[in-house]
Amino acid sequence: MEKLTDLNYTLSVITLMNSTLHTILEDPGMAYFPYIASVLTVLFTLHRASIPTMKIALKTSKCSYKVVKYCIVTIFNTLLKLAGYKEQITTKDEIEKQMDRVVKEMRRQFEMIDKLTTREIEQVELLKRIYDKLMVRATDGIDMTKEINQKNVKTLEEWKSGKNPYEPKEVTAAM
């Protein structure tokens, strides 16, 4: 990592590039010189900033390929933004992350739909049971023993003596 923070070296290289360009292009009518110089300055700065950054990242990280890919994609996206483009380069990892997010959201919605469908089915079954209980059913004969609480009433033939002991008897009283 030689000359990583050597500002004088960077400034001297920029000055050398500018003086070289001035000597090559001495024509005073050159209208595009400032643009060419600024593009070269940006490229040189990117070169000086990205090489040491990538070296440090490669040494400290375990997955060097992803770091290099991320750095290159970031550099290209920066250049595209400088050029005025709104589009960006995306990596497969970003696309996979977005796909995973979309699939997760779809699963969540499917689960919600399943829960709602189950609830609706339960409500329909409950309404059917309520309707069945409210339905008027025609019967042949009405069993009134339930209504007058006389389920265990014995008939005359069932009594031992043949008479109903609860039936009132004629009683004569002396006056």
From Swiss-Prot:
GO annotation, biological process: monoatomic ion transmembrane transport; symbiont-mediated activation of host autophagy; viral process
Compartments, record wording: Host rough endoplasmic reticulum membrane; Host membrane, Host caveola; Secreted
Bilayer-spanning residue ranges: 29-51
Side Cytoplasmic, residues: 52-175
PTM comment, free text: The N-glycosyl content is primarily Man(9)GlcNAc, with a small amount of Man(8)GlcNAc.
GO cellular component: extracellular region; host caveola; host cell rough endoplasmic reticulum membrane; membrane
Topology within the bilayer: Single-pass type III membrane protein
Domain notes: Binds 1 calcium ion per tetramer.
Positions annotated as glycosylated: N8, N18
GO MF: channel activity; metal ion binding; toxin activity
HAMAP family: ROTA_NSP4
Annotated family: Belongs to the rotavirus NSP4 family.
Protein name: Non-structural glycoprotein 4
Lumenal side, ranges: 1-28
Lineage summary: Viruses, Riboviria, Orthornavirae, Duplornaviricota, Resentoviricetes
Biological function: Plays an essential role in the virus replication cycle by acting as a viroporin. Creates a pore in the host endoplasmic reticulum and as a consequence releases Ca(2+) in the cytoplasm of infected cell. In turn, high levels of cytoplasmic calcium trigger membrane trafficking and transport of viral ER-associated proteins to viroplasms, sites of viral genome replication and immature particle assembly. The secreted form acts as an enterotoxin that causes phospholipase C-dependent elevation of the intracellular calcium concentration in host intestinal mucosa cells. Increased concentration of intracellular calcium disrupts the cytoskeleton and the tight junctions, raising the paracellular permeability. Potentiates chloride ion secretion through a calcium ion-dependent signaling pathway, inducing age-dependent diarrhea.
Pfam name, any one: Rota_NSP4
Keywords: Activation of host autophagy by virus, Calcium, Enterotoxin, Glycoprotein, Host endoplasmic reticulum, Host membrane, Host-virus interaction, Ion channel, Ion transport, Membrane, Metal-binding, Secreted, Signal-anchor, Toxin, Transmembrane, Transmembrane helix, Transport, Viral ion channel, Virulence
Keyword Nucleus found: no
Residue sites binding Ca(2+) per the record: E120, Q123
Protein's organism: Rotavirus A (strain RVA/Human/United Kingdom/A28/1987/G10P[X])
Subunit structure: Homotetramer. Interacts with the immature particle in the viroplasm. Interacts with host CAV1, early and late in infection. Interacts with host integrin ITGA1/ITGB1 heterodimer. Interacts with host integrin ITGA2/ITGB1 heterodimer. Interaction with microtubules blocks trafficking to the Golgi apparatus.
